Structures are given as structure tokens and as C-alpha cells.
């Protein structure tokens, strides 16, 4: 391709994606055909405009900052983009707070396996027969109030370790209590980190897609 064609591809990318970086300069130089195909592919959300440019940058931040990815160059770039689009430091911090709960999936994976193994050994009653007292009922009600949903998984978590559940509840509720992003956008962040190719957490994605749809 000619330099003129490359400049046209670069201009098209900037128009659709709203930024440019030295990384894309290298890709364009190495393989214009691949760059052109990727540019068209990655620009579809921007052209559809279902989400505002700032919200799209928040989603990029969440994916790059998630514990399954931790991609520093992308994180820095998309924070810069979000700030340029008018994002506040509190909004970006809220995105990071929402993203940080991804670590709980250690338990969402492990706890159901633990329960299955206990039941297979005939020991399921050790947990199944636990009845919630006022303390546990209060935690459950607070979770539903703060987070807007409940899942059967949380019943087992709450029975296994009410103290741990309470700490997670306090931790995960911070952006829901003091944050400024609308609830629907919070759910978009959860959807993004659950469906990222480095995670692909089906059950979490289902819960948060359902929540987002209920929120409009």
C-alpha cells in the first residue's frame, strides 16, 4: 500500500475509535491488510453508538485492569482517553472498584465444588441444615439492597462463612453506595469483565446481563 493509503486507514481509525497510538502505527506498518480488517471489526460498537464514548472507555479500562488480564499499556491509554472525554477521577476509580470484585470468582468456582463433594460423601447436611439467624438474614437483605440481586450460590457462601461474606459484602458494596455511575453502567462493567476472553465466566455473565436488562 502507498503512504497515502496508510494515512487514510489511520484517519479512518482515529475517526471511528477516537484515538491513535504508536502500537497501531507498528501494526499498520507491518500488515496494512490485517490492520484494515481489525479497524473495521473493532469500530462496529463505535458506529452503532449504543454506548457513549466515555462509557466505552470505561469498559476498556475494566477489561485491561481485570485480574485475568492486567494489560498496563491499554489501561494507561484508555484512562487517558476517558479523561479526555470528561471522565472524573472518581468515575475511573469507581470502574476499578467494580472490576476488583473479580477475585470473588475463586469462591464462585470453588464453593459449588466443595458443596458437591460434601454431598457426594454424605456430608451435605453439615451445610444444608444450617438455618439463617437474624445476623445472616440481615446480611442477605443488605446484599440485595446494595447489589440489587441474589443468587443461590450466595446462600452456600453465607452458610460456610458469614464473616467472610460480610467482608465481601462491605467491599463489593462501596461503588454501589458511594459511586456515581448509574446502576446499568455498573452492570455493563461486570458483563465486560465476565465475558472478557481471558475469563469467560458464563454464570456471572448471565446474572449481570439479566440485571442490566432489568435496569433498562
Regions found by a protein language model. Give the residues of each.
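Short acidic alpha-helix initiation/capping motifs at coil-to-helix transition points
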Residues: 33-39, 68-75, 163-169, 199-205
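Amphipathic, charged-and-aliphatic alpha-helical interface segments
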Residues: 56-71, 186-201
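Hydrophobic, ordered structural segments
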Residues: 93-115
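Generic structural signal for hydrophobic core residues of well-folded globular domains
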Residues: 45, 62-66, 99-103, 118, ...
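Amphipathic alpha-helical hairpins
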Residues: 48-59, 74-92, 180-188, 204-215
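Acidic, glycine/proline-rich low-complexity segments that act as flexible tails and inter-domain linkers
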Residues: 1-55, 84, 107-185, 214
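Amphipathic alpha-helical interaction segments
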Residues: 49, 66-70, 86-89, 102-106, ...
Amino acid at each position: 500500500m502507498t503512504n497515502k493509503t496508510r494515512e487514510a486507514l489511520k484517519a479512518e481509525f482515529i475517526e471511528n475509535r477516537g484515538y491513535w497510538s504508536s502500537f497501531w502505527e507498528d501494526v499498520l506498518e507491518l500488515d496494512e491488510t490485517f490492520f484494515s480488517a481489525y479497524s473495521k471489526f473493532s469500530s462496529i460498537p463505535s458506529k452503532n453508538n449504543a454506548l457513549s464514548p466515555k462509557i466505552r472507555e470505561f469498559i476498556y479500562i475494566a477489561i485491561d485492569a481485570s485480574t485475568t488480564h492486567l494489560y498496563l499499556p491499554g489501561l494507561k491509554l484508555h484512562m487517558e482517553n476517558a479523561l479526555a472525554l470528561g471522565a472524573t477521577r472518581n468515575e475511573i476509580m469507581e470502574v476499578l472498584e467494580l472490576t476488583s470484585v473479580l477475585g470473588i470468582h475463586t469462591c464462585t468456582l470453588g464453593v459449588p465444588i466443595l458443596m458437591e463433594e460434601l454431598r457426594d460423601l454424605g456430608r451435605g447436611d453439615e451445610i444444608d441444615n444450617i438455618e439463617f439467624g437474624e445476623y445472616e438474614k440481615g446480611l442477605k437483605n443488605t446484599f440485595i439492597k446494595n447489589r440489587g440481586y441474589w443468587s443461590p450460590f450466595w446462600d452456600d457462601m453465607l452458610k460456610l462463612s458469614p464473616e467472610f461474606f460480610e467482608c465481601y459484602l462491605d467491599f463489593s458494596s462501596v461503588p454501589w453506595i458511594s459511586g456515581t455511575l448509574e446502576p446499568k453502567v455498573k452492570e455493563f462493567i461486570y458483563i465486560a469483565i465476565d465475558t472478557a476472553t481471558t475469563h469467560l465466566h458464563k454464570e456471572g455473565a448471565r446474572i449481570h446481563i439479566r440485571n442490566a436488562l432489568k435496569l433498562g
